[in-house]
Amino acid sequence: MDAIKKKMQAMKIEKDNAMDRADAAEEKARQQQERVEKLEEELRDTQKKMMQVENELDKAQEELTGANAQLEEKEKKVQEAEAEVAALNRRIQLLEEDFERAEERLKIATEKLEEASQTADESERVRKVMENRSLQDEERVYQLEAQLKEAQLLAEEADRKYDEVARKLAMVEADLERAEERAEAGENKIVELEEELRVVGNNLKSLEVSEEKALQREDSYEEQIRLLTQRLKEAETRAEFAERSVQKLQKEVDRLEDELVHEKEKYKAISEELDQTFQELSGY
């Protein structure tokens, strides 16, 4: 009887120990399950952050691409404006050359006109001298008349040349007037171009400022990309570590669950053995 009581006490103690171990195993399994759930939550948060980082990286790259496209377009407009200014400067130079040639033609025509005027004055003087001497010598008169006719012819030729010079002068004046109009138009165009050039200069300054800002933004984007890439690598490392931890903890949970099942089976066997012992005692 004492042996049975001792056996019952030992079985009871073993039962209590098995229950304690089962409770401890359940508590440990619960804690491990909570750790697994926490790590899974951290893993989901990490994956969300990774997606956010990737989206921010794509957005930064798109903004950088847009800024580069705008900068290239503005540089193209500046080059076109510079080409137009160069072409207009060439046209102004051609107008100045035409004006110089017109001034040279006008100078030559003026000199010819002065020569014709001097010839006419000389012919008139000779004619007067011949008239004063006509009474002295008939032959001299004939000579003078011949000289007079020649002088008249010279005068007519001078008049003709004068008319031609005057006509050419009128043409030159017309050319000069057109050249002046073209020069004035060129000057007006220069003023317009200077204004456009000033605007282009201001735009160029704005473009330079935009370019500096774009470069700064590009540096900032590169820094952000570097940081985001670093954060991405860290997140991937943490994710890999979390996955390994989850796998490890899952194995531990499986082991504890197996141990719990084993303890429950052991507890069940002890309970059945106690029931059988009680039945045997009741038989006595």
From Swiss-Prot:
InterPro entries: Tropomyosin
Coiled-coil ranges per UniProt: 1-284
One Pfam family matching this protein: Tropomyosin
Keywords attached to this entry: Coiled coil, Repeat
Compositionally biased spans, kind Basic and acidic residues: 12-38
Residue numbers spanned by region Disordered: 1-47
Function: Tropomyosin, in association with the troponin complex, plays a central role in the calcium dependent regulation of muscle contraction.
Entry's free-text remark on domains: The molecule is in a coiled coil structure that is formed by 2 polypeptide chains. The sequence exhibits a prominent seven-residues periodicity.
Binding partners and assembly: Homodimer.
Family of this protein: Belongs to the tropomyosin family.
Protein name listed in UniProt: Tropomyosin
Source organism (scientific name): Trichinella pseudospiralis (Parasitic roundworm)
